[in-house]
Swiss-Prot record:
GO cellular component, one term: cytosol
Protein family membership: Belongs to the uroporphyrinogen decarboxylase family.
Residue positions binding substrate: R23, Q24, A25, G26, R27, D72, Y155, S209, H322
Location, primary (coarse class): cytoplasm
Full protein name: Uroporphyrinogen decarboxylase
Gene3D superfamilies: 3.20.20.210
EC primary class: lyase
CDD domains: URO-D (cd00717)
GO molecular function (one): uroporphyrinogen decarboxylase activity
Organism: Anaeromyxobacter dehalogenans (strain 2CP-C)
Domain of life according to the entry: Bacteria
Length: 346
């Protein structure tokens, strides 16, 4: 069976535009909140049965054209030697942001990090992938994912504080230490994706969310070479690859050369301009998730406007410019998904 999402990743013709949304499994869903009333966030991430349950729920509830593994970009950090916790948040269940108890600050800290062995260190993720595939019964494909080296490093180095000051200072003051850190995080990303695909993931998205914090020369030295290596590793698995970032519209042409099948863009650029600047790859995005918080008729109209601007050329996937926000009405999500499915060029 050829899924329209996978076909769009390869810029092949599809019967309708595929749609999925980042954070489509999350706190805006009553079904997700019901699960989270019983377990903490990390407990959820470490339960294959619950991983499958919350991953598949949005497919049943909204009819998305792809599922994405429910996990976290930092889930492997404890296996690398870092003390990861999530703040208690409003409900006391780990709803807050991540905290690293022993952040990476020195070369000795970097040298002490261990590249994880997913089968031994992250079996619940791989078992979760297998459980999802069984539950989906090939209705839609499953996307695996990891965090990009810079984004994961921003949490590992900053320790959970807002901003990027310590990490960016490391780039300039101790570039060899920064490269050593990115090397280990790149290796960690590659082994995770390889094992996710071996377990059944049918595509791979790299969440390099905070890439827009870097100047072009720093991207060239500290990011793009590592992202290209991850893209090559995904290519060897045979599944499509997606690179997601925000604040990087100035660098689209360069990002198109990293080796990814799909470039996911944020809402800060017109989608027709993004497609024109990315002629050799598929494009994903770039609906502003805040629209889903507004009037339903506006949300639907803007989705249709985006589809018209994206055009009929194969290789477009409807998604958000970032994740679904807490408090988003589920009715708006369903209305937009239905509008995308109903849209046609004939």
């Amino acid at each position: 069976m050829t899924h329209r999402f996978l076909a769009a990743c390869r810029r092949e013709p599809v019967d309708r535009v595929p749609v999925w949304m980042m954070r489509q499994a999350g706190r805006y869903q009553p079904s997700y909140r019901a699960v989270r009333q019983k377990v903490s966030f990390l407990e959820l991430c470490r339960s294959p049965e619950l991983i499958a349950q919350v991953t598949v729920a949005p497919i049943d509830e909204f009819g998305f054209d792809a599922a994405i593994l429910f996990s976290d970009i930092l889930v492997h950090l404890p296996a690398m030697g870092l003390d990861l916790t999530f703040e208690k948040g409003e409900k006391g269940k780990g709803d807050g942001g991540p905290k690293i108890g022993n952040p990476v600050r020195t070369r000795a800290d970097v040298d002490a990090l261990r590249v994880p062995v997913p089968k031994k260190d992250l079996p619940y993720v791989l078992d979760g992938v297998r459980a999802i595939r069984t539950a989906l019964a090939d209705r839609v494909p499953l996307i695996g994912f990891v965090g990009g080296p810079f984004t994961v490093a921003s949490y590992a180095v900053e320790g959970g504080s807002q901003g990027f000051t310590r990490l960016k200072t490391m780039l300039y003051a101790e570039p060899a230490t920064a490269h050593a850190l990115f090397e280990k995080l790149t290796q960690a990303a590659i082994v995770q994706i390889e094992e996710q695909v071996a377990a059944g993931a049918q595509a791979a998205q790299i969440f390099e969310s905070w890439l827009g914090e870097l100047a072009r020369e720093d991207l060239e030295e500290f990011s793009f070479p590592y992202l290209a290596r991850i893209a090559e590793a995904v290519r060897k698995t045979g599944v499509p690859s997606i690179i997601f970032s925000t604040g990087t519209t100035a660098h689209l042409e360069r990002m198109a050369k990293l080796g990814y099948d799909v470039v996911s863009v944020d809402w800060r650029i017109p989608i027709d301009e993004a497609r024109a600047r990315l002629p050799g790859v598929a494009v994903q995005g770039n609906y502003d998730s805040t629209l889903l918080l507004g009037p339903r008729e506006v949300a639907v109209a803007r989705a249709q406007q985006l589809l018209r601007a994206a055009g009929p050329t194969p290789g477009y996937i409807f998604n958000l410019g970032h994740g679904i926000q807490v408090g988003t009405p589920t009715e708006n999500v369903k209305a937009v998904v239905d509008a995308v499915h109903a849209f046609g060029w004939k």
